[in-house]
Amino acid sequence: MLISIDQVLSKTEVRDFRAQLDAAAWEDGAATAGTLAKSVKRNQQITDGSELCQRLGQHILRRLSSTPLFISAALPRTIYPPKFNRYADGGTYGAHVDSALMFLPGSHQQMRTDLSATLFLAEPEEYDGGELEVEGPFGVQAVKLAAGDMVLYPSSSLHRVTPVTRGARVASFFWIESLVPDEGERTLLFDLDQSIQQLTPLVAPDDPRLVQLTGVYHNLLRRWARP
């Protein structure tokens, strides 16, 4: 399941982010890549753990906590602190799958990566190339969203970023461990929740159909969740 979420950040917030990121020091992204990914990764990143990275990342997390579509789709248990990258001058990231387990920064606690997220911080017309290509059961989906919009996709997906031939592609990226690890179960819960949300304004709060569907949702979540 690949889901686009509009306006996680407003245009004003994006401009503020970019003013700070464009003035920041960037490092070679290959330094943080795994052994296999290092050979196909050509981008820049903001230093992990820097004050800027932490401050902007916390702002993103606050926005996500009040974004119902994100909560419904991800059912987040743990979110890896957002990171920031930049692709320019032919920068690219070849086909790869994200690591299944990651240590949370500054701790010995591991998290499982169920979902990957990219929050775009550059408008599509600012750069050529730079599409996020995600392979799924129905082929390859190319994603290039407006600044402030975000895409969620399974971390198990083979994916790549195509070469940026003009301008710069700036984004935040991070991973989510879901309360419901199984992608199929999580998708069913998302579809059911969205149907409930669409039905809610059309019927009375005590409508038996709405009450029953809501009960089914929570009982399935109770069965499948791993808190």
Curated annotation (Swiss-Prot):
Fe cation binds at residues 96, 98, 159. GO terms for biological process: DNA damage response; intracellular iron ion homeostasis. GO terms for molecular function: 2-oxoglutarate-dependent dioxygenase activity; iron ion binding; L-ascorbic acid binding. The keyword Oxidoreductase applies. It comes from the Bacteria. Pfam families: 2OG-FeII_Oxy_3, PKHD_C. Keywords: Dioxygenase, Iron, Metal-binding, Oxidoreductase, Vitamin C. 2-oxoglutarate binds at residue 169. Its cofactor is Fe(2+); L-ascorbate. Disulfide bonds: none annotated. Residues 78-178 form the Fe2OG dioxygenase domain. Binds 1 Fe(2+) ion per subunit. SUPFAM superfamilies: Clavaminate synthase-like. It is an enzyme of class 1 (oxidoreductase). Transmembrane segments: none annotated. Its EC number is 1.14.11.-. The keyword Cytoplasm does not apply. HAMAP family: Hydroxyl_YbiX. PANTHER family: PKHD-TYPE HYDROXYLASE YBIX (PTHR41536:SF1). This is PKHD-type hydroxylase Ajs_0512.
